[in-house]
């Protein structure tokens, strides 16, 4: 099963071809074919242990793969929001200081992106004192500071309450529309993300099924992995699908702690 569905008007940002990865003598990714275009939202779903986070890190170039190809647009700039980022309680750090760790940070741009993500009020606050929603928005602001062509998010609503989840997904959608960046998202929140997703990739070490939410909702592999209740939830959403290579290193900054 491959996922290379792009509309003719979409510039390809990143492509995986027959991608395989092994960890500890075990194959964790098998024959992945995947492309994402400019302005497109692609959501990767799958059970625990399906290889979702591994796939993201392989695509970003921070973990190795065993076979296949990863092809990125020349000079592709990526903003990355990790699944988790440990905060050292012994060494307090403010939001401003963390954002200043990025290369060539412009103070005006920093304030603007914090305003855009709704957390300008925490500029001088310690990271340890932020709520779950505030912390995720700060990580999103850090990613957007790079003016990315591709925004990659690994379970971005962890530690966020229900109302915060809704608001955060709405913010991600607004950033995509405003900046025109592609979005590659890993999520378990089927009832949240499917409404605004262009394509769904159902992963369980290999791509089980892929396509629009409407297409995936009718696929037997989706029902087998997630059950009839999830299928019915996904089918509730009406979807409107909208919508060419260089081997180059990706321009993405990921802290060593985030790769653990």
Curated annotation (Swiss-Prot):
Give the bilayer topology.
Peripheral membrane protein
Q: Report which reactions are catalysed by this protein.
A: Zn(2+)(out) + ATP(in) + H2O(in) = Zn(2+)(in) + ADP(in) + phosphate(in) + H(+)(in)
List the molecular function annotations (GO) for this entry: ABC-type zinc transporter activity; ATP binding; ATP hydrolysis activity
Q: Which Gene3D superfamilies match?
A: P-loop containing nucleotide triphosphate hydrolases (3.40.50.300)
Q: Where is the ABC transporter domain?
A: 14-229
Which GO CC terms are listed, alphabetically? plasma membrane
What keywords sit in the KW lines?
ATP-binding, Cell inner membrane, Cell membrane, Ion transport, Membrane, Nucleotide-binding, Translocase, Transport, Zinc, Zinc transport
Broad class of enzyme this protein falls into: translocase
Answer whether the UniProt record assigns the keyword Nucleotidyltransferase to this protein.
no
Show the SMART domains listed in the entry: AAA (SM00382)
> PANTHER family under this entry?
METAL TRANSPORT SYSTEM ATP-BINDING PROTEIN TM_0124-RELATED, ZINC IMPORT ATP-BINDING PROTEIN ZNUC
What function is annotated for this protein?
Part of the ABC transporter complex ZnuABC involved in zinc import. Responsible for energy coupling to the transport system.
Q: How does it assemble?
A: The complex is composed of two ATP-binding proteins (ZnuC), two transmembrane proteins (ZnuB) and a solute-binding protein (ZnuA).
What's the name of the protein?
Zinc import ATP-binding protein ZnuC
Q: What gene makes this protein? A: znuC
């Amino acid at each position: 099963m491959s996922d290379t569905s792009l509309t003719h008007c979409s510039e390809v940002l990143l492509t995986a071809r027959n991608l395989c990865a092994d960890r500890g003598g075990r194959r964790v990714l098998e024959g992945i074919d995947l492309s994402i275009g400019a302005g497109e939202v692609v959501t990767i779903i799958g059970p625990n242990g399906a290889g979702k986070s591994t796939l993201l890190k392989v695509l970003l170039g921070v973990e190795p793969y065993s076979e296949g190809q990863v092809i990125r647009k020349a000079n592709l700039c990526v903003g990355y929001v990790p699944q988790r980022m440990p905060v050292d309680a012994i060494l307090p750090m403010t939001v401003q200081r963390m954002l200043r760790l990025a290369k060539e940070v412009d103070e005006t741009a920093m304030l603007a992106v914090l305003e855009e993500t709704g957390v300008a009020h925490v500029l001088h606050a310690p990271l340890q004192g932020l709520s779950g929603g505030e912390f995720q928005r700060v990580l999103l602001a850090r990613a957007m500071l790079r003016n990315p062509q591709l925004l990659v998010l690994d379970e971005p609503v962890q530690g966020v309450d229900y109302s915060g989840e809704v608001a955060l997904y709405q913010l991600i959608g607004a950033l995509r529309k405003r900046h025109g960046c592609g979005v590659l998202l890993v999520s378990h929140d089927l009832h949240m993300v499917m409404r605004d997703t262009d394509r769904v990739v159902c992963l369980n070490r290999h791509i089980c099924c892929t396509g629009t939410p409407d297409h995936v909702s009718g696929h037997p592999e989706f029902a087998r992995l997630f059950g009839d209740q999830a299928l019915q939830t996904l089918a509730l959403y009406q979807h409107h699908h909208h919508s060419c290579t260089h081997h180059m290193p990706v321009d993405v900054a990921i802290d060593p702690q985030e790769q653990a």
